[in-house]
Each structure stands twice: as C-alpha cells, then as structure tokens.
C-alpha cells in the first residue's frame, strides 16, 4: 500500500494504531471505557452475524481467510477504525 497514514514527516508523528494506544493510555478513563465497550459490542454483533451465515464452527476459519486473502483491505480498515475511535474519544473529551 501507499502507507498513507504513516508519513514520517507528518506533524502528528505515528500511525493510527500508535495514536489510538496513546489515547487509550492517557485519555479520560470513562471515555476510553465507553469507546472500548462500543467496539466490543460491534465486534460481538459482527461475530453473531458471521455465525448465522457460516455456522458457529466456521467463524474463525472465515475470519482467518479474509485476513489472509484481503490483507491490504483489512489493514486499511483497521487504520480507519483506529482513527474513528481516536476521534470518538477526543470529541467526547472536549
């Protein structure tokens, strides 16, 4: 990929993941708790949808297959989700 989010000359320095971790470790605990709760609830809903479509015993295999076959897309989506989560915490912190 183009490393769109990891420009070394970026004034914010760091990847979306590193910024997310900075926020998790340093922001208001309640705000971080709320965001992590939101993420877990979404992940649980997605797992349930996958179970309904593919069956409970195949969920892990389907996830691994997508991670392997669409690695670039998964990486980009993960970076976008880090950015969204950072934004959610920071906007609540104002």
Predicted regions: what they are:
Residues 62-77:
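Short, mixed-charge aromatic SLiMs
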């Amino acid at each position: 990929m183009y490393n769109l989010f990891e420009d070394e000359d970026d004034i914010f320095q760091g990847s979306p993941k590193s910024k997310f971790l900075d926020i998790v470790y340093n922001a208001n605990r309640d705000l971080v708790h709320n965001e992590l709760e939101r993420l877990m609830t979404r992940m649980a809903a997605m797992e349930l949808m996958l179970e309904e479509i593919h069956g409970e015993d195949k969920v892990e295999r389907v996830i691994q297959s997508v991670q392997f076959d669409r690695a670039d897309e998964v990486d980009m989506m993960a970076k976008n989700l880090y950015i969204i989560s950072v934004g959610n915490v920071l906007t609540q912190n104002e």
